[in-house]
């Protein structure tokens, strides 16, 4: 059975009309992912970046070591933006980010059992529990990631008071203040555009095969002759690379440049090759669906 919630979710992902979404879900027996493909094949939806609904509160924070060779990024969730703005909560998150840069833990469960650097006794888990008791709101350390580099630097960018956090790792044999400028510019690009891949080598064959099939069906539906469809498909794959690979994207600060071209220009300035080696992007509440409150229903319950 196709529910209104399923139709709503598909509309949010694709931007397609309600009836088109319902038909696509019916055609695919309620499989949202396949329904997205059906809508794209019919030209009714743009290529979807399914990052999931963003609903949870909290903060994304980064920590960069003084030598800029090691860094971390963390997400700590809470229930309301009121607590997210609380100075004690911010302090907790900042300490957790700093501790994450040096941890040997491989997952969150192990990490939160470590002795907390913000107090003389107790673990990270204990510190979180204590603040939960004090502020009366549930909190959790959701995820963390580390980056390190030998020759080069790592820089960060935080957008929207902790809504989005980015780490960017640059490799370069020469030290220069220009590297920080480049890394911050690239980090802002990642925050703004949310590229799925660093470069073409990160795009797996399964993804490319799926895209090719969608483009092929689109071309045939447009009435294009079979003999030119393959050429059209490959042209659209090249466009896919340019839209989804960070180094091939048009730079948001100057559309005359791609990120790759901008980095090469700066390499000349430094006198050594600069390479964008890695990036990490966390968005607060990414993929977490928050319970939607029905105000009218809540009033009814209170009146009963």
UniProtKB/Swiss-Prot annotation:
A single Gene Ontology CC term: cytoplasm
MF term (GO), any: translation elongation factor activity
Protein name per UniProt: Elongation factor Ts
Main function: Associates with the EF-Tu.GDP complex and induces the exchange of GDP to GTP. It remains bound to the aminoacyl-tRNA.EF-Tu.GTP complex up to the GTP hydrolysis stage on the ribosome.
Gene: tsf
Main subcellular localisation: cytoplasm
Keywords, comma-separated and alphabetical: Cytoplasm, Elongation factor, Protein biosynthesis
Family: Belongs to the EF-Ts family.
Pfam families according to UniProt: EF_TS
UniProt entry tagged with the keyword Ribosomal protein: no
Superkingdom, natural source: Bacteria
Gene3D superfamilies attached to this UniProt entry: 1.10.286.20, DNA helicase RuvA subunit, C-terminal domain, Elongation factor Ts, dimerisation domain
Stored CDD domains: UBA_EF-Ts
Cited NCBIfam families: tsf
């Amino acid at each position: 059975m196709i529910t209104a919630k399923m139709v709503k979710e598909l509309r949010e992902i694709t931007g397609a009309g309600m009836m088109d979404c319902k038909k696509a879900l019916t055609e695919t027996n309620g499989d949202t992912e396949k329904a997205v493909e059906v809508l794209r094949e019919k030209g009714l939806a743009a290529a979807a970046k399914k990052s999931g609904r963003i609903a949870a509160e909290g903060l994304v924070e980064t920590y960069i070591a003084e030598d800029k060779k090691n860094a971390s990024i963390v997400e700590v969730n809470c229930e309301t933006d009121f607590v997210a703005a609380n100075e004690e909560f911010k302090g907790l998150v900042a300490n957790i980010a700093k501790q994450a840069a040096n941890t040997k833990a491989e997952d969150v469960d192990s990490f939160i059992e470590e002795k907390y650097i913000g107090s003389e006794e107790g673990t990270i888990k204990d510190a979180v529990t204590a603040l939960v008791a004090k502020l009366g709101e549930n909190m959790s350390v959701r995820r963390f990631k580390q980056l390190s580099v030998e020759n080069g630097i790592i820089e960060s960018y935080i957008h929207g008071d902790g809504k989005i956090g980015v780490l960017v790792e640059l490799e370069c044999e020469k030290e220069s203040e220009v590297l920080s400028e480049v890394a911050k510019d690239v980090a802002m690009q990642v925050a703004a555009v949310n590229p799925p891949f660093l470069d073409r080598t990160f795009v797996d064959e399964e993804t490319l095969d799926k895209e090719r099939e969608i483009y092929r069906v689109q071309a045939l539906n447009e009435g294009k002759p079979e003999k030119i469809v393959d050429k059209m498909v490959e042209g659209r794959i090249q466009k896919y690379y340019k839209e989804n690979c960070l180094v091939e994207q048009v730079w948001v600060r100057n559309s005359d440049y791609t990120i790759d071209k901008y980095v090469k220009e700066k390499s000349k300035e430094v006198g050594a090759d600069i390479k964008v080696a890695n990036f990490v992007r966390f968005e607060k509440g990414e993929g977490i669906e928050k319970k939607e409150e029905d105000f009218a229903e809540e009033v009814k319950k209170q009146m009963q």
